[in-house]
C-alpha cells in the first residue's frame, strides 16, 4: 500500500486528479479499448473533480474514451432530486467534460427489482474486464461507498441499510434533517472494489484520523472496511495533514521519505 501524505485538502485534489490523468493518458484509450474509471460522490472528491475539469479544459486529458462506474446511490430518491448521486455527478463533473453519455454508469436506486439491478451492474463491470482505477472516499467509521462496518470483505453490489451515523453525517446535505436521508442504498461491494486493477482512496480532515490509522497501522478487520486495502496489490491513499493525527510520527515520516519525489510540485 502507498500513502501520499500531503499538507492540505487542495493538494490531495490536485495530486489525485493528476494521477488519474496520468493513468488515462498512459493507457491511451480508444472506443474499442476504453479506460474504466470508478468514481465516488461526497465532499472529499470535489477538489479532484474541479482539478480534472481544469486539466480537461487545458487540453491535458480527454474523457471521450473513458467509461465510468459510480460507487453507490440512494434507494427511493428521485433521479432528479438535488441530492441524488446522479445529480451530483452531472453537476460537479460530467456536465463539464467530454464524456459520452452512454459511457456513464450509475446505479438505479428506483429500480423495481434491486437485486436484479445490482446484478446488472456487476455484469456491466465484468463486460469491460475490470475497472482500471477506482477512486473512493472514506467515512469517519472507515466505510467505503456504503459498505458500512461489518460488511463482508468479499461482498458484491447489493442493497444496504445505512447506519444512523452515516445518515447523521449525510443530513448536512438534507437541511440537517436525518429523517430526510434515505434509509437504504445500492452500493458496490468490497469484493467489487478489490477486483479493480488499482484503488485510490482520498482521506481528508481530522475526523477521518481513526479511519486512516485503521487502514495503515491496523489489521484487516471487517469493522473497518478501509482496512481491506491491505489485501490489494495496487492501492494508494492520498491524505492531508489533519487526517494523519492518529498515525505514529514515524509512519508519516516513512511515507514522506518514500514518496518525496512523487509529491514534488504539489
Swiss-Prot record:
Give GO BP annotations, semicolon-separated.
carbohydrate metabolic process; glucosamine catabolic process; N-acetylglucosamine catabolic process; N-acetylneuraminate catabolic process
UniProt keyword list: Allosteric enzyme, Carbohydrate metabolism, Hydrolase
Task: Name the reaction it catalyses.
Answer: alpha-D-glucosamine 6-phosphate + H2O = beta-D-fructose 6-phosphate + NH4(+)
MF GO annotations = glucosamine-6-phosphate deaminase activity; identical protein binding
Pathway membership, UniProt: Amino-sugar metabolism; N-acetylneuraminate degradation; D-fructose 6-phosphate from N-acetylneuraminate: step 5/5
The cross-references to InterPro entries, in alphabetical order and at most eight, read: Glc/Gal-6P_isomerase (IPR006148), Glucosamine6P_isomerase (IPR004547), Glucosamine6P_isomerase_CS (IPR018321), NagB/RpiA_transferase-like (IPR037171)
Q: What Gene3D superfamilies does this protein's entry cite?
A: 3.40.50.1360
Q: Name one Pfam family in it.
A: Glucosamine_iso
Residue(s) at site: Part of the allosteric site? 151, 158, 160-161, 254
GO CC terms: cytoplasm
**Active-site residues, Swiss-Prot/TrEMBL:** 72 (proton acceptor), 141 (for ring-opening step), 143 (proton acceptor), 148 (for ring-opening step)
**What is reported on the regulation of this protein's activity?**
Allosterically activated by N-acetylglucosamine 6-phosphate (GlcNAc6P).
Q: Does the keyword Hydrolase apply?
A: yes
**Record EC number:** 3.5.99.6
Q: Which family does it belong to?
A: Belongs to the glucosamine/galactosamine-6-phosphate isomerase family. NagB subfamily.
Q: Quaternary structure per UniProt? A: Homohexamer.
User: What HAMAP family does the entry give?
Assistant: GlcN6P_deamin
Give the protein's function: Catalyzes the reversible isomerization-deamination of glucosamine 6-phosphate (GlcN6P) to form fructose 6-phosphate (Fru6P) and ammonium ion.
Specify the protein name: Glucosamine-6-phosphate deaminase
Gene (name only): nagB
Amino acid at each position: 500500500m502507498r500513502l501520499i501524505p500531503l499538507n492540505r485538502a487542495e493538494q490531495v485534489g490536485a495530486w489525485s486528479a493528476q494521477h488519474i490523468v496520468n493513468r488515462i493518458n498512459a493507457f491511451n484509450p480508444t472506443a474499442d479499448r476504453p479506460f474504466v474509471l470508478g468514481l465516488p460522490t461526497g465532499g472529499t472528491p470535489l477538489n479532484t473533480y474541479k482539478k480534472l475539469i481544469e486539466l480537461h479544459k487545458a487540453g491535458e486529458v480527454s474523457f471521450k474514451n473513458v467509461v465510468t462506474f459510480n460507487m453507490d446511490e440512494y434507494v427511493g430518491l428521485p433521479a432528479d432530486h438535488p441530492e441524488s448521486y446522479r445529480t451530483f455527478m452531472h453537476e460537479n463533473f460530467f456536465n463539464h467534460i467530454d464524456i459520452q453519455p452512454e459511457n456513464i454508469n450509475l446505479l438505479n436506486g428506483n429500480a423495481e427489482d434491486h437485486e436484479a439491478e445490482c446484478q446488472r451492474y456487476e455484469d456491466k463491470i465484468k463486460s469491460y474486464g475490470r475497472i482500471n482505477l477506482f477512486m473512493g472516499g472514506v467515512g469517519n467509521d472507515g466505510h467505503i461507498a456504503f459498505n458500512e462496518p461489518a460488511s463482508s470483505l468479499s461482498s458484491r453490489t447489493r442493497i444496504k441499510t445505512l447506519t444512523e451515523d452515516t445518515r447523521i453525517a449525510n443530513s448536512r446535505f438534507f437541511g440537517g434533517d436525518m429523517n430526510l436521508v434515505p434509509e437504504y442504498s445500492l452500493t458496490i461491494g468490497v469484493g467489487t472494489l478489490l477486483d479493480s486493477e488499482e484503488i485510490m482512496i482520498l482521506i481528508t480532515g481530522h475526523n477521518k484520523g481513526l479511519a486512516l490509522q485503521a487502514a495503515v497501522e491496523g489489521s484487516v478487520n471487517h469493522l473497518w472496511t478501509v482496512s481491506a486495502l491491505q489485501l490489494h496489490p495496487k492501492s494508494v491513499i492520498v491524505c492531508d495533514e489533519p487526517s494523519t493525527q492518529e498515525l505514529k510520527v514515524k509512519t508519516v515520516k516513512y511515507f514522506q521519505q518514500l514518496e518525496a519525489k512523487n509529491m514534488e510540485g504539489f
